[in-house]
Amino acid sequence: MKQVVYTASPESQQIHAWQLNNEGALTLLQVVDAPGQVQPMVVSPDKSFLYVGVRPDFRVVAYQIDAEGKLKEAGHAPLPGSPTHISTDRQGRFIFVGSYNDACVSVTPIGENGLPGEPLQVVKGLEGCHSANIDLNNQTLFVPALKQDRIALFSLDKQGKLTPRAQAEVKTRSGAGPRHMAFHPNQRYAYSVNELDSSVDVWDISGDEVKKVQSVDALPEGFSDTRWAADIHITPDGRHLYSCDRTASNITIFSISAEGSSLKVEGYQPTETQPRGFNIDHSGQYLVAAGQKSHHIEVYKISADRGLLQPLARYAVGQGPMWVVINKLD
């Protein structure tokens, strides 16, 4: 399996491209100077483009990915607000950008050439909008509004238009602050990490109504410092889930029940200082975490049984790394 890891470092305005081998070792392929503070990133479903959000000139930049995983800037388009999170629909026709500061989510079309265009739609009133997450069926967009303790639910049509569902939202606990999400491969359950209380909620998304079925504390009992969760990801086989907390500088390891409805904490892995983002490779064997204050990334081996993390190596990147994405080239 040929994989490339991309890391975004906004303080030095750089993207680093790393080759990930089958033993979990990284080799630096390329350092790209980005046109601004690069933060959120996503790989297109066809694996041929990397879309990134940059500040302070708010725009989405498209990089073409060559056969080795190297990047070449191919085009850009304006955004209506500061990009906090970026994602695509499952068919690679639309880009969704959540903006925390501008309290909105926008829809950007992707042309047949893979390049972004002018925004098609901007949905406002999403206070603290922190991500936009399309389900595996490519039908419902889940948009956490952190400051409102809710996740807004939108239907996506073939033209890229978002319309509030009959069930327009689900609520989290007061003060939880929903942030990022992950979906179980069986398409029946979703998981959201809450920034302000470092909890993880489990949602049954299999029926017409989205229902919360569990909420789990992601920090050890007795943790008394400020809670500040950031990211969440699931292994491709749906057996293990991970979340990170920036104050604790740890990654919480969960096992997932067979049907996906229940989480159990398996352990806590100390990691790079202030882990803002991490990701899991396509084989489900490795996790790569970025330390926003350590200016390093660290690679871990995922154990097959409980999902525990074994540190392999750490690598210096740019300043203030915030985002990690992994592309499978073959």
Swiss-Prot record:
The EC designation for this entry is 3.1.1.31
Reaction(s) the record says it catalyses: 6-phospho-D-glucono-1,5-lactone + H2O = 6-phospho-D-gluconate + H(+)
Q: Tell me which InterPro entries the record gives.
A: 6-phosphogluconolactonase_YbhE, Cycloisomerase_2, Lactonase_7-beta_prop, N2O_reductase_N, WD40/YVTN_repeat-like_dom_sf
GO MF, one example: 6-phosphogluconolactonase activity
This protein's UniProt keywords: Carbohydrate metabolism, Glucose metabolism, Hydrolase
Pfam families assigned to the protein according to its UniProt record, in alphabetical order: Lactonase (PF10282)
Question: Is-annotated flag, keyword Hydrolase?
Answer: yes
What do the Gene Ontology cellular component annotations say?
cytosol
Q: In which pathway does it act?
A: Carbohydrate degradation; pentose phosphate pathway; D-ribulose 5-phosphate from D-glucose 6-phosphate (oxidative stage): step 2/3
Would you identify the family this protein belongs to, as annotated?
A: Belongs to the cycloisomerase 2 family.
Relate the protein's function as given in its record: Catalyzes the hydrolysis of 6-phosphogluconolactone to 6-phosphogluconate.
Question: What is this protein called in UniProt?
Answer: 6-phosphogluconolactonase
Q: Which gene encodes it?
A: pgl
